[in-house]
């Protein structure tokens, strides 16, 4: 009910400004066009036409269907819902899928909290709200709906990692890996690095308890889960990765990363912790309003010493360093060019 009320307020703001989700950035030219193609293809399946075109120039986004359009949501299970919308409600379909992904991000955040042993319902609810309505969702998710896939699957992947650390089956993690890769390989690459950082921090907190042998076994289990997940979604993952590696934009966009950003960038980054700024600042949009900032301040000023607090501090410092140096943005972007489209990871930690 709370999310519905907040979503309604958001829609009323757009209506008051005579704005539309589809008119933002690449809405009509890219995301809406691909979403229409996905909807029409799915409807053809329902009417008995099971032929999936491998090449289609009509969308105007590139050459092959799977390799190019996976970035825009071909393979994303959420897009299956497009078949339920009539031809005269396509704008509503576009808005619904954005808000639905935001809602699912809150659910997956709550599930992660449950898996990690965070039982206080008030804390989980507040964290979910901060995560769902963080700057990345309100700016990135509105302009580019596919950006929400990174937010949606990160908590699931971290929950799967927790299950492995708790000596449970790797099946949940493997399925999450497959779904995340099939939904968007680009953000799954970033989530893989974020999960690697998470695993290292968690293992560092238990290195005396676990010992070298157990740590190596856990790393092998994680690797096995990732490989299994890739195999499950290989029919979509492999063509997508191949297309990305042979993309002319990647070949021409490689640039040398500077050692540091400008002073203006750091000023905006600090403000971005508690404000939703109108500019993306190189997609450094990690803000979780005053609630997330208050949580970080309490974490570093608290006299309570615990393993969990220590791990949170280490994780925050690591992500902050990556936000502060251009190399961090370049690494997270496949070493092509500098951008912090992974900044929802910081929003997750602050929430």
What do the PLM-derived regions correspond to, one by one?
Residues 29, 37-42, 47, 70, ...:
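Periplasmic/ER-lumenal interhelical loops and adjacent helix-loop junctions
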Residues 7-109, 129-151, 244-249, 257-286:
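Membrane-interface coil-to-helix junctions
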């Amino acid at each position: 009910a709370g999310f519905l009320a907040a979503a309604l307020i958001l829609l009323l703001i757009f209506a008051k400004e005579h704005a539309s989700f589809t008119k933002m950035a690449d809405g009509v030219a890219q995301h809406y066009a691909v979403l229409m193609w996905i909807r029409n293809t799915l409807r053809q399946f329902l009417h008995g036409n099971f032929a999936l075109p491998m090449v289609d120039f009509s969308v105007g986004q590139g050459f092959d269907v799977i390799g190019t359009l996976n970035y825009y949501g071909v393979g994303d299970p959420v897009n299956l819902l497009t078949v339920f919308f009539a031809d005269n409600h396509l704008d509503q379909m576009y808005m619904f899928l954005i808000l639905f992904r935001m809602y699912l991000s809150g659910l997956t955040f709550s599930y992660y909290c449950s898996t990690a042993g965070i039982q206080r319902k008030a804390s989980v609810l507040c964290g979910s709200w901060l995560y769902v309505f963080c700057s990345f969702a309100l700016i990135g998710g509105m302009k580019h709906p596919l950006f929400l896939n990174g937010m949606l699957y990160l908590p699931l992947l971290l929950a799967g990692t927790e299950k492995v650390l708790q000596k449970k089956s790797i099946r949940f993690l493997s399925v999450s890996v497959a779904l995340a890769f099939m939904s968007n390989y680009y953000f799954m690459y970033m989530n893989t690095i974020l999960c690697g950082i998470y695993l290292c921090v968690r293992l560092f907190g238990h290195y005396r308890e676990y010992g070298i042998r157990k740590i190596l076994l856990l790393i092998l289990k994680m690797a096995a889960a990732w490989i299994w997940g890739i195999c499950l979604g290989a029919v979509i993952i492999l063509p997508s990765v191949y297309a990305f590696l042979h993309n002319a934009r990647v070949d021409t966009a490689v640039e040398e990363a500077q050692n540091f950003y400008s002073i203006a960038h750091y000023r905006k980054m600090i403000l971005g912790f508690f404000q939703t700024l109108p500019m993306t600042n190189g997609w450094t949009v990690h803000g979780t309003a005053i609630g997330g900032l208050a949580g970080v301040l309490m974490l570093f000023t608290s006299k309570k010493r615990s393993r969990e607090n220590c791990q949170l501090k280490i994780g925050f410092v690591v992500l902050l360093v990556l936000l502060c140096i251009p190399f961090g943005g370049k690494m997270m972007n496949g070493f092509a060019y500098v951008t912090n489209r992974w900044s929802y990871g910081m929003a997750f930690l602050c929430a």
